[in-house]
Amino acid sequence: MLKQSIEIINKLGLHARASNKFTQTASQFKSEVWVTKNDSRVNGKSIMGLMMLAAAKGTVIELETDGADEAEAMRALTDLINGYFGEGE
C-alpha cells in the first residue's frame, strides 16, 4: 500500500471534468484507489464520491493505492494532479 499527500493546484479544483479524468485514470489500474480529505475517505474510482469531497484549489488530499500495480497507479494519478488535469492551470 502506498500513501501520498498532494495539493489540488488547478484553478477549479476537483470539479466534474477533473473528477471524471481522475476516475478514468484510476480505473485503468487493478489496484484499489482511495482519496481522503479531512475525515472523508472515498473510492477514487467513483466520480460521485470524488465530487462529494468538494476539493477546491489549495486543498490537500491523501491518495492511497493498494494492489499489484499500486506504484504505477500512484504515479499516474499524481502526474494527472500535478499536470492540472490537462486544463493548463
Swiss-Prot record:
Pfam families found in the cross-reference section: PTS-HPr
Sequence ranges assigned to domain HPr in this UniProt record: 1-88
BP-aspect Gene Ontology terms: phosphoenolpyruvate-dependent sugar phosphotransferase system
Subcellular location: Cytoplasm
Any one cellular-component term (Gene Ontology): cytoplasm
Described function: General (non sugar-specific) component of the phosphoenolpyruvate-dependent sugar phosphotransferase system (sugar PTS). This major carbohydrate active-transport system catalyzes the phosphorylation of incoming sugar substrates concomitantly with their translocation across the cell membrane. The phosphoryl group from phosphoenolpyruvate (PEP) is transferred to the phosphoryl carrier protein HPr by enzyme I. Phospho-HPr then transfers it to the PTS EIIA domain.
UniProt family annotation: Belongs to the HPr family.
Record NCBIfam families: PTS_HPr_family
PANTHER family per the UniProt record, alphabetical: PHOSPHOCARRIER PROTEIN HPR (PTHR33705), PHOSPHOCARRIER PROTEIN NPR (PTHR33705:SF2)
Name of the protein described by the UniProt record: Phosphocarrier protein HPr
Taxonomic placement: Bacteria, Pseudomonadati, Pseudomonadota, Betaproteobacteria, Neisseriales
Gene: ptsH
